[in-house]
């Protein structure tokens, strides 16, 4: 074996591996040049002496290709049976990898701004610039018909606050939305509170939810009250105060007869005696008091 190694080393130094990239036949199959060595020996195709040539892919400083970038696609790959299969070198531009990654970074950063643009377009109609200041555009006012206003007013006199089912039922019957009914009731309540605060309407005459039959008009005096009739006659300039023995009806007829003297005789002829009129009025006053 020592003689074989001695013969092997001079054959490697003979200048077969002087090229920076040796051929596959000289580097991987040296057993064909020395028929004395068996093919299955441990020194086959991968033995290099320290003084010999550089291994595959190594560039010495003295070579012409030293310092240059090596193309990884120029290497030769061996198949199963040991034959070298050369693949042509491809540039990066053929595969579309010539452009660096940072060129795509700008487009990636612009994606969120493009998605947020429709949101700004949707929100723009709600805000309008007036004299350089943003102003929110108000929705148009709802115009209620006379029928709707009458129905809402009747319901407000019954109760000032509506529950959800009641509001939904009222809105469906009037052809309005629940929001419109709610806003109308809110405006009506605020208007009533403002009137009460200014003193135009006393609190006792304002409609309340506890008393649905409340009436805002003052009570009218009864017709059969003697005091009310005497008050009404006292305001008249030509009226005379009633005497104790005359009824209010007879005194009123006498006053009217003084205005029309021609009809005084006919009125006095049809008048009953004063005592007959005082008797039923006394009975009526006794029943009231």
Swiss-Prot record:
Residues 1-49, 198-253, 270-289 are annotated as: Disordered. Disulfide bonds: none annotated. Interacts with XRCC6 (Ku70). GO terms for biological process: anatomical structure formation involved in morphogenesis; axon guidance; axonogenesis; BMP signaling pathway; bone morphogenesis; cell differentiation; cell population proliferation; cellular response to zinc ion starvation. The lineage of its organism: Eukaryota, Metazoa, Chordata, Craniata, Vertebrata. Transcriptional factor involved in bone development. Acts as an immediate early BMP-responsive transcriptional activator essential for osteoblast differentiation. Stimulates ALPL promoter activity in a RUNX2-independent manner during osteoblast differentiation. Stimulates SP7 promoter activity during osteoblast differentiation. Promotes cell proliferation by up-regulating MYC promoter activity. Involved as a positive regulator of both chondrogenesis and chondrocyte hypertrophy in the endochondral skeleton. Binds to the homeodomain-response element of the ALPL and SP7 promoter. Mainly expressed in several neuronal tissues and developing tissues. Phosphorylated. Phosphorylation of Ser-34 and Ser-217 by MAPK14 enhances its transcriptional activity. Phosphorylation by CaMK2 increases its protein stability. It comes from Rattus norvegicus. GO terms for cellular component: chromatin; cytoplasm; nucleus. Pfam families: DLL_N, Homeodomain. Residues 32-46, 206-220, 242-253 have a biased composition (Polar residues). The gene is Dlx5. PROSITE patterns: HOMEOBOX_1, HOMEOBOX_2. Gene3D superfamilies: Homeodomain-like (1.10.10.60). One of its GO terms (molecular function) is RNA polymerase II cis-regulatory region sequence-specific DNA binding. This is Homeobox protein DLX-5. Keywords: Activator, Developmental protein, DNA-binding, Homeobox, Nucleus, Osteogenesis, Phosphoprotein, Transcription, Transcription regulation. Belongs to the distal-less homeobox family. It comes from the Eukaryota.
């Amino acid at each position: 074996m020592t003689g074989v190694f001695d013969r092997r080393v001079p054959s490697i130094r003979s200048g077969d591996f002087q090229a920076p990239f040796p051929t596959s036949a000289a580097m991987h199959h040296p057993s064909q040049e020395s028929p004395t060595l068996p093919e299955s020996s441990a020194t086959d195709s991968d033995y290099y002496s320290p003084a010999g040539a550089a291994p595959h892919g190594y560039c010495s400083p003295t070579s012409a290709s030293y310092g240059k970038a090596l193309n990884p696609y120029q290497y030769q790959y061996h198949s199963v049976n040991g034959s070298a299969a050369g693949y042509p070198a491809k540039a990066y531009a053929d595969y579309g990898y010539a452009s660096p990654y940072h060129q795509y970074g700008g487009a990636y950063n612009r994606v969120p701004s493009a998605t947020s643009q429709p949101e700004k377009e949707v929100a723009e109609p709600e805000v309008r610039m007036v004299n350089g200041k943003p102003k929110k555009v108000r929705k148009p006012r709802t115009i209620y018909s006379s029928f709707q206003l009458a129905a809402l007013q009747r319901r407000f006199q019954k109760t000032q606050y509506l529950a959800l089912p009641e509001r939904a039922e009222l809105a469906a019957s009037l052809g309005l939305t629940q929001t419109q009914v709610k806003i109308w009731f809110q405006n009506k309540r605020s208007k009533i509170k403002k009137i009460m605060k200014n003193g135009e309407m006393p609190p006792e005459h304002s409609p309340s939810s506890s008393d649905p039959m409340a009436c805002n008009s003052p009570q009218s005096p009864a017709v059969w009250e003697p005091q009310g009739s005497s008050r009404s006659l006292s305001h008249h300039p030509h009226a005379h105060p009633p005497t104790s023995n005359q009824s209010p009806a007879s005194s009123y007829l006498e006053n009217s007869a003084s205005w029309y003297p021609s009809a005084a005789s006919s009125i006095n002829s049809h008048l009953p005696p004063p005592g007959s009129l005082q008797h039923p009025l006394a009975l009526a006053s006794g029943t009231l008091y």
